[in-house]
Amino acid sequence: SYAYKLPANLDMAAMAPLLCAGITTYSPLKKWKVGPGSNVAVAGMGGLGHMAVKFAVALGAKVTVLSHSDSKESDARAFGATDFIDTGKTDWHLGYQKRFDLILNTVSAHLDLEPYLSTLATDGSLIVIGVPSEPFSVSAGSLLDGRRSLSGSLIGGIPETQEMLDFCGTNNIVSEVEVISADYINKAYDRTVASDV
């Protein structure tokens, strides 16, 4: 079957992004067995990032948001993150080495992954779900030290998407949305490009 049963208790407009951003962030959190006791970092606090924070918190993890925009801190905490690290600061990663079990990178801009990898605990994984236009490079030593892994994830299948929708219904999780009229679409696009959403 290709139809989903939508939770009756959730707003329809706020559920729409769950079928993209929702499952894209839920799937790797489940695959890497995030739950109580997990120490998770979410890089980026946009459309994907805010969903990753909500899901990881609901799964029982301690969540830290990594963002170059300190204006995102209040939203990160409102969604349940316990910590916020401003990655716009030089040497931001110092003092956070070997802290996280999992980093979910939701950023679509090019990032130097080396500082992020240094914050992974032994056997930690950095999962890429943002799609930058430039390739990144990683030194072998950054992976060998601590047996770290670098992986990627893209969306999820139909059964997992239904599981995610059910989880959202049970935990009252929806995307943050702004509903607009059709005549505002060009302005909305411009705002999205300018990161004004």
Question: Residues of each region from the PLM?
Answer:
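Generic hydrophobic/aromatic pocket-lining and core-packing "Φ" positions
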Residues: L29, V53, E73, L113-Y116, ...
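Rossmann-fold NAD(P)-binding glycine/threonine-rich loop
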Residues: G130-R147, I158-F167
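NAD(P)H dinucleotide-binding glycine-rich loop of Rossmann-like/cofactor-binding domains
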Residues: S1-A43
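Helix-to-beta-strand junctions that scaffold the AdoMet/dcAdoMet cofactor pocket
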Residues: L120-T122
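N-terminal Rossmann-fold NAD(P) dinucleotide-binding loop
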Residues: G49-H50
